[in-house]
Amino acid sequence: MSSRPPYLPPIPTHVPGATAAELAALPEPVILISGISGGGKSVALNALEDAGYFCVDNLPPELLPEFIRLQRAQAVRKVAVAVDVRNAASLPKLLPLVDQLRREGTRILPMFLESRSDTLVRRFSETRRRHPLSSRQDDQGQTRSALIDAIEHERELLASLREVSTVIDTSDLRPAQLRTWVRQLVGAAHSSLTLVFESFAFKHGVPRDADLVFDLRVLPNPHYVRELRPLNGRDAGVIDFMHAQPEAAEMLAQIEGFLLRWLPSYAMDQRSYLTVALGCTGGQHRSVYGAEQLAQRFRERVPTLVRHREIEAREAVL
């Protein structure tokens, strides 16, 4: 049985953007990795190195243009650069330099890795590493309050860079999951715009990387059907249940129509990614179903990725 209900409206077959030939002719974008200390930049950079990228960590921002020109002159196609708060004094120069490089025709994909503060505190405690901005210490190293202060200060310093980047929240990701997610994002980087559908549970908060948020809690909940409770929105039983709900069909059709109407405008805004977050109570049934169904409808029109935050978080602790 088809996973697409017959009563849904047809989908337009074209979203404005570059042609396949034009996209293929573009050079590889330079991947610019930044983010909060402890957020996973090293894991991301290692994943890119394994994927064939020439990677440099902690490059001073003022050296970025000359470094990229040198790599291009040597015909190095895949380049990734990590910058972080260790070069705090030079960070204000970074965004103007990125704008300059783009005007010169260099494609740059900024990726910003972050985590919740409690997760960062735990990671620093486990690794016994000191935060680069932490100054106050007790006899056993940095105090918790000093560490939290340093994390919040770092967020302030990097706020403008986060604003223009594709944000990846690594709070609930294992290193292997982060490596996979980074490779998927980079693999889609030749498109003019990539759609990311992300399911989540409102009780755990709205994803920090969401651009658009839709609330699916008003839809009938499969959780209250005993045999469906242990399943999720990718399972046939839940799919059949949701297909039978007129409200679900109407809501997804309206979200689909909204995205089709505004995708060209988002693409013209020079975004690389648009993250559409769909939430329900537990992040297992309705939101997962909605993310999967919308991804199916857009996959043949624009590059599309799907992630399920709560399912991935549960798998991370198994």
From Swiss-Prot:
Protein name: Nucleotide-binding protein Lcho_3490
Origin species: Leptothrix cholodnii (strain ATCC 51168 / LMG 8142 / SP-6) (Leptothrix discophora (strain SP-6))
Binding positions (GTP): 84-87
Function: Displays ATPase and GTPase activities.
Residues engaged in binding ATP: 35-42
Listed GO MF terms: ATP binding; GTP binding
Family: Belongs to the RapZ-like family.
Pfam families assigned: PapZ_C, RapZ-like_N
Keywords for this protein: ATP-binding, GTP-binding, Nucleotide-binding
